[in-house]
Design a protein with these regions (language model features):
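C-terminal motif of bacterial Sec signal peptides marking the signal peptidase cleavage site
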Residues: 13-16
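Early extracytoplasmic/lumenal segment of secretory-pathway proteins
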Residues: 18-93
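A structural signal for short loop-to-beta-strand junctions that line the ligand-binding cleft
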Residues: 78-83, 99-130, 146, 156-162
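Periplasmic solute-binding protein
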Residues: 88-96, 116-142, 170-174, 178, ...
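Ligand-binding "clamshell"
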Residues: 94-102, 114-118, 225-237
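Periplasmic-binding protein-like
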Residues: 107-112, 126, 187-191, 197-198, ...
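Ligand-binding pocket segment of bilobal, Venus flytrap-like solute-binding proteins
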Residues: 173-240
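Mature extracytoplasmic/periplasmic domains
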Residues: 252-303
Length: 324
């Protein structure tokens, strides 16, 4: 039976379960602990079907952002076996934390999206996009990364907190790549335009849809799902190019259930799961993954990962000054 536990509460809840597993729980060898910041819509059906087919008992531990999960894994003794849903720019900053694994179907993944050491396995493509509320914004609509620092949007932009959300961190990296000027000046201009930082990319879509913010930065799947459900959202692929990275799964080094984690990665790459991802308005990784992609920003995720700690230090300093 699958369990979903918010990560910050997981230790308390697990300690309250008693001295041993419940009667319905399997032996330890038939367990798998997944860490994820993705919405249940991404993983729920896949986890249920994986459990049904394999008999492996999956526990899903969730958090609002990918970066706290990575930090917990890096600290050691996290208890997690698999990180589900993270991009190479964030993963590469924690590369030593993950065990290489070459899945049998990895050859179907375009080389451009694979890690040279197979420390993480892509299972879908996930562009970072802009959105705006089309009831509130009907002229001079934002269509570029550069628009995010325009004074026209002062206090009206929603962005996931870059210190928590990998999507927010990617947005900062994209702005620095596209815009001229000193890093601190670019980041200052962007921070002044924010209505406030939000805990996740999903929260950005909600804030733009309800009109609390006019413009936002989020992931393509969340943006398309919001628009498809009839909310007042228009999706924009930035004129300079969208940042397109693979969404990946990575096995925690020295985890307790490595074989089960490998089996789950194999399942993610199966035709059935890849087809299901397409139905969820996500881009499957196998086959012609580049088909119908929007204009893509040339983006080096490994360089971004190497710069991540320095970037976040600057951002924390700026936002602390704004709050003072």
């Amino acid at each position: 039976m699958r369990r979903v536990i918010p990560l910050l509460c997981s230790l308390l809840l697990l300690c309250s379960c008693g001295a041993g597993p419940s009667a319905s729980a399997p032996e330890d060898s038939s367990r798998l602990v997944i860490f994820t910041a993705r919405s249940a819509a991404v993983y729920d059906d896949a986890v249920r079907e994986f459990e049904r087919r394999t008999g492996i008992w999956v526990e899903v531990r969730t958090a609002d952002g990918t970066l706290p999960l990575l930090e917990q894994i890096a600290a050691g003794s996290s208890g997690g076996d698999l990180l589900l849903g993270a991009a190479p720019d964030s993963l590469s900053a924690y590369g030593d934390c993950f065990a290489p694994y070459t899945a049998p179907l990895a050859a179907d993944i375009p080389d451009a999206y694979r890690d040279s050491e197979d420390r993480w396995t892509p299972f879908s493509l996930l562009p970072t996009v802009l959105i705006y509320n089309d009831q509130l914004v009907q002229r001079n609509v934002p269509d570029s990364w550069a628009d995010l620092v325009s004074v026209a949007w002062r206090g009206r932009i929603a962005c996931p907190d870059p210190t928590v959300s990998a999507t927010g961190c990617t947005a900062l990296q994209a702005l620095l790549q596209v815009l001229p000027g000193e890093e601190e000046a670019v980041l200052t201009a962007f921070s002044r335009n924010l209505s406030g930082v939000l805990p996740s990319a999903a929260a950005v879509a909600d804030a733009v849809a309800d009109g609390s913010c006019y413009v936002g930065v989020t992931t393509e799947d969340l943006a398309l799902q919001a628009a498809d459900s009839g909310l007042s959202i228009t999706v924009v692929y930035p004129a300079e190019g969208a940042v397109v990275q693979p969404d990946c799964a990575a096995i925690v080094r020295d985890c307790a259930h490595e074989d089960n984690a490998r089996a789950f990665i194999d399942f993610l790459l199966s035709s059935e799961v890849q087809t299901r991802l397409a139905r969820q308005l996500r881009r499957p990784i196998r086959g012609d993954a580049d088909a119908a992609l929007p204009p893509v920003l040339s983006y080096d995720p490994y360089g971004a990962g190497a710069h991540q700690a320095e970037l976040l230090a600057i951002w924390r300093s700026l936002t602390a000054e704004d709050a003072a």
